[in-house]
Amino acid sequence: MRRQLSLAFSIIVLACLVSLAVVSAENWPQWRGPMLNGISNEKNLPVKWSTEENVTWKLAMPDRSGSTPIIWDNLIFLNVADGTKATGTLSFWAVDRTKGTVLWKKPLGTGDHMMRKQNMSSPSPVTDGKTVWVLTGMGVLRAFDFKGNELWMRDIQKEYGKFGLNWGYGSSPLLYEDSLYVPVLHGMRTDDPSYLLKIDKATGKTIWRHERPTPAQMESPDAYITPAVLKNGNKTEIVLSGGDCVTGHDPATGKELWRAYGLNPQNIQFNRIVNSPIAFDGLIYAGSRGNPYMAVKAGGSGDITNTHIAWTFANGPDVPTPVTDGKYLYLV
């Protein structure tokens, strides 16, 4: 989940992002970029801008959104709430990144509504350069080619039950190799179990669905995170945080490989998690609702709470996901 911004501000931010994209050759295929770490290798990018300075073009958006643009070559893809309260329409836009013109729009569904401060356009799209996938907060997942032709559609809520997050669904799907990973970590407004869903990116078919029980109560099971990919030696794991703990999962089966508690030492019942876990150089960084923030060492098995927590500190971020370059961890 990304906290909603005012409409005017979201237009300015989009213009700045596009301005950076025009001078950058690097694709930005999903939330937090090609390596899922929020870092770009491009140099000499603008560091100052206003409503006029370093802005190549502006594109007015019909409503606010918590999702981020993704970029592939000359295309920008956007998950858009159309602001039509009568129908609550969501749509998917492809934009020419050099001109700021909308190339095509495709409907994603109706029923958009506000859940506290966010609407149903919070999940960011993801692409592999040929296909682009977009998920709405209503659980509709669609695949399109770059010309806007729909390839397949899934309705996750219809298949597996309604999402039960207090602030509405806001996780972005993770694309790793040939699959999409969709986390549904909830509990405040449902008794249904949390789970991680793996979907074949080409066909849209479920490969596996792994339930993820935790002892968290009230709002604490709710998490708005996007999964991280941990590479440790010749092993790869999908990492989740939520429900008072961090877990690592086998990409082939979904099986939970390890679990570390410590994100809610005071057992607060409203400890929902917004900032996503990150994995870098043998460490997994994960936070909760500000306190604590912790680093977990890779390579564990089973309950690793007492053996693999490298460090913790208080006053971590509530919403923003940190960035690391391997030497420093940057938090807002």
Question: What are the roles of these predicted feature ranges?
Answer:
Residues 1-6:
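Positively charged n-region of N-terminal signal peptides that target proteins for export
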Residues 8-21:
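Bacterial N-terminal signal peptides
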Residues 22-332:
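Noncatalytic, solvent-exposed loop/strand surfaces
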